[in-house]
């Protein structure tokens, strides 16, 4: 919640130190950047230790802030490096860390007092329940999902006392951030590890549309929406672009600084957007034009650009008979692009009229086609001159006292900070006594510093005829500037007190021994009645010795069937259980919650709450932080006696994450899809009652909640078409002539290699699931997983027909030919 409505934060990106300087000079209040480890832009320039310390100092000199991105998922072995990585930045005064991993969050919270933690957009915070959970955990700020409307953001602001940060400009992902495995599963480069290869920006085909960029949204520009965004309660306006140039960072930062200040000073009546400013932003970077993101629409087709995935620039004219009829002025050094993709660099500028092209420049371009400028050379030069070639300066006042026979004294002051330094005793001058002009000349030599002052800012007091060497004045000036810098910076600096903890990684605990699983259970997820009926029939057949799989639990998904459909399916299992005399053969039924739990879905579950309670589900499979807080708030957690399993997409990459979830009341976990066999084994053996001894990170705590004496339930998906994307965008809607809303079902994409990716449009929740082209298959690794300590393996049925379900149940998938091992063998980068 915003306490001071006259202040808002412009938060700019920096992939390099030059970008950082550009952001500060252009008016950013804060800069977010990545260090040498654990950032979500592993291919940005990023900052080494020296540069990052320098950035923190520079920002604090100017009264700005630095936020460090640690917004990736960390494995157990990487946690050991985390505290020592953060420590020097914390001690220098780092303002906040942006975090995705729940384990990382807990470690930073418990080891770095006073360090603000910001919940990354990778945590998929889509409403007030998730924001409330993160505040309870200790977050000072949440970065909302890009898909939220201004109204939904306002609902968070009005109900949770926490700062809100939202993206306002730059690239949009087609998938909810934190829910994407497309790059991970296709090429082994995980977005959750900062290495996304952006296969979403490649061509796909569906619904008769061939080879278009069906998963590529336009860039977002919300300059015109600033009044509504600020009124919704957004405190920090975040600009995307840690892979962008310094000119881009400076130009976009300046524009948002200008219009945020305009609205705060003049209100709606005085808020007027200059079309020229929007044009300059288009010149800097746009993908097929701009959109306003999701602030005003849930999944408007205008968000998408099917024709190109990269910078389009602006239209500057049209082709006619080998010439360009200019609609915009062009400059020397501008780069023009024609319809066939060819480029031409302008040798000399021209304001209007016809621009003749050398013979052969235009090859296949037809008359009447548009010519785009993809580089505005003059604009880039202007930005560089204003914001990159020179740094902003802090005003400084100086007062120097030069008295014959006494020590020289220099006092400097900048805002409310001051420093006083002394020199040697001044002797009487025989030939060249000090003059005011001479003194001012030396004191004004502030080049290479953060300060500036005019003659009027320097007070010179001379008593007698002292001899004042130039060296003395220079030494006084340097010492005073060093002291006032330290005075300014000292407020943010801290000292980390290291607790006296036993060091080590894993040490054998003879009391509990290695985690073991006596029986490997089998669970199944279904999406419709046909799949469920096939399972029931197969399980019945198993009683007669035909089935290879004994089902202990069924998860009922609601993406296609809705809540009522899941309740109806629950009654089918109840009927089956009534005819089972052996309690050990009875099947538990868990309700699988949606992947995304936005306010419209919250209202739906509120409406169906009594029906859900009456249905008598045995537990819940939850898939978002929103749902975890929701079930705590409405009594469902107590209703099910804490029988809650979190799904793979809530990411338990490490022991510390398991510990943190356990503190929040969760002891059932679906293991990550991005850990290989060795990493899974290490994680399984580090958690719960059967953890191998006490696990700590060097001298630091993994979290205050780990007692090594818990029963932890671990489940691993062993078969299924894995969702690679969860999207607010509806590609079926974007590519259909009619409106497909309300017609939930399965449709298919084809990628450039001819592989088909199934997708489900879940109209009840208004999101899409896009699945891998082949299923993951690990059912033959069941014994291996059991020996790791996994309690159950799960079969995830999604798009399978009834006969396919029966085949997999009866043969343990032995007949499956085309499949993937996921990351079980190779892991991710």
Predicted regions and their residues:
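Long, basic N-terminal domains or extensions that often function
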Residues: 140
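Active-site pocket-lining/capping segments in soluble small-molecule metabolic enzymes
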Residues: 2-125, 143-236, 243-829
């Amino acid at each position: 919640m915003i306490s001071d409505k006259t202040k808002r934060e412009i938060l700019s990106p920096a992939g390099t130190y030059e970008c950082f300087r550009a952001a500060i000079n252009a008016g950013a209040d804060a800069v977010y950047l990545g260090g040498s480890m654990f950032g979500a832009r592993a291919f940005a320039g990023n900052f080494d230790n020296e540069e990052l310390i320098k950035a923190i100092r520079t920002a604090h000199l100017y009264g700005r802030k630095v936020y460090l991105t640690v917004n990736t998922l960390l494995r157990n072995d990487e946690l050991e490096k985390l505290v020592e990585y953060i420590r020097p930045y914390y001690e220098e005064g780092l303002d906040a860390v942006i975090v995705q991993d729940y384990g990382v969050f807990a470690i930073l919270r418990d080891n770095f007092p006073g360090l603000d933690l910001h919940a990354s957009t990778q945590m998929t915070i889509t409403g007030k329940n998730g924001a409330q959970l993160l505040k309870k955990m200790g977050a000072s700020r949440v970065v909302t999902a890009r898909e939220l409307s201004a109204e939904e953001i306002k609902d968070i602001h009005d109900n949770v006392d926490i700062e809100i940060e939202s993206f306002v400009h730059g690239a949009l992902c087609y998938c909810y951030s934190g829910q994407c495995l497309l790059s991970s599963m296709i090429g082994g480069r995980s977005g959750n590890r900062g290495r996304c290869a952006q296969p979403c920006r490649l061509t796909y085909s569906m619904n008769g549309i061939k080879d278009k960029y069906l998963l590529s949204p336009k860039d977002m520009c919300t300059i015109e929406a600033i009044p509504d965004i600020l009124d919704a309660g957004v405190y920090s306006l975040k600009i995307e672009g840690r892979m962008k140039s310094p000119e881009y960072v400076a130009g976009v930062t300046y524009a948002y600084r200008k219009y945020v200040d305009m609205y705060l000073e003049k209100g709606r009546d005085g808020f007027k957007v200059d079309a020229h400013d929007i044009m300059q932003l288009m010149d800097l970077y746009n993908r097929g034009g701009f959109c306003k993101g999701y602030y005003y629409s849930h999944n408007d087709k205008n968000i998408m650009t099917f024709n190109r995935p990269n910078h389009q620039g602006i239209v500057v004219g049209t082709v006619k008979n080998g010439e360009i009829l200019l609609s915009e002025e062009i400059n020397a050094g501008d780069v023009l692009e024609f319809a066939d993709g060819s480029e031409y660099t302008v040798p000399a500028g021209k304001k209007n009229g016809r621009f003749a092209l050398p013979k052969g420049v235009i090859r296949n371009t037809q008359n009447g086609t548009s010519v785009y400028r993809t580089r505005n050379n003059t604009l880039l030069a202007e930005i560089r001159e204003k914001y990159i070639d020179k740094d902003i300066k802090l005003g400084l006042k100086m007062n120097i006292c030069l008295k014959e026979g006494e020590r020289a004294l220099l006092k400097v002051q900048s805002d409310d900070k001051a420093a006083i330094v002394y020199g040697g005793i001044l002797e009487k001058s025989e030939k060249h006594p000090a003059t005011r002009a001479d003194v001012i000349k030396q004191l004004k030599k502030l080049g290479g510093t953060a300060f500036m002052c005019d003659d009027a800012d320097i007070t010179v007091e001379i008593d007698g005829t002292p001899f004042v060497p130039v060296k003395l004045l220079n030494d006084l000036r340097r010492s005073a500037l060093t002291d006032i810098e330290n005075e300014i910076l000292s407020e943010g600096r801290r000292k980390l007190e290291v607790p006296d903890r036993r060091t080590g990684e894993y040490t054998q605990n003879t009391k509990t021994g290695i985690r073991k699983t006596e029986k490997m259970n089998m669970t199944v997820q279904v999406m419709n009645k046909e799949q469920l009926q096939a399972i029931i029939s197969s399980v019945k057949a198993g009683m007669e010795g035909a089935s290879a799989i004994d089902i202990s639990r069924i998860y009922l998904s609601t993406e296609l069937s809705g809540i009522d459909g899941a309740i109806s399916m629950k009654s089918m299992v109840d009927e089956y259980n009534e005819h089972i005399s052996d309690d050990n053969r009875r099947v538990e039924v868990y309700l699988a919650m949606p992947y995304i739990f936005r306010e419209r879905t919250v209202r739906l579950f509120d409406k169906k709450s009594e029906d859900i309670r009456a249905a008598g589900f045995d537990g819940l499979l939850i898939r978002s932080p929103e749902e975890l807080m929701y079930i705590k708030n409405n009594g469902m957690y107590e209703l099910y006696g804490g029988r809650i399993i979190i799904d793979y997409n809530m990411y338990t990459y490490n022991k510390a994450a398991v510990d943190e979830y356990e503190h929040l009341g969760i002891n059932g976990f679906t293991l990550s899809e991005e850990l290989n066999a060795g990493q899974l084994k290490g994680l399984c053996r580090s958690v719960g009652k059967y953890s191998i001894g006490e696990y700590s990170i060097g001298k630091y705590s993994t979290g205050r909640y780990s007692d090594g004496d818990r029963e932890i339930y671990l489940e691993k998906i062993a078969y299924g078409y894995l969702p690679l994307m969860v999207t607010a965008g509806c590609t079926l809607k974007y590519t259909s002539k009619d409106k497909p809303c309300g017609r939930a079902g399965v449709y298919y994409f084809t990628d450039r290699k001819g592989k088909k990716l199934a997708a489900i449009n879940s109209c009840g929740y208004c999101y899409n699931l896009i699945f891998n082209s082949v299923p993951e298959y690990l059912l033959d690794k069941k014994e291996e997983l059991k020996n790791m300590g996994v309690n159950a393996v799960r079969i995830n049925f999604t798009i399978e027909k009834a006969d396919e379900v029966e085949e997999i149940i009866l043969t343990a998938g032995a007949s499956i030919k085309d499949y993937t091992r996921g990351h079980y063998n190779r892991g991710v980068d």
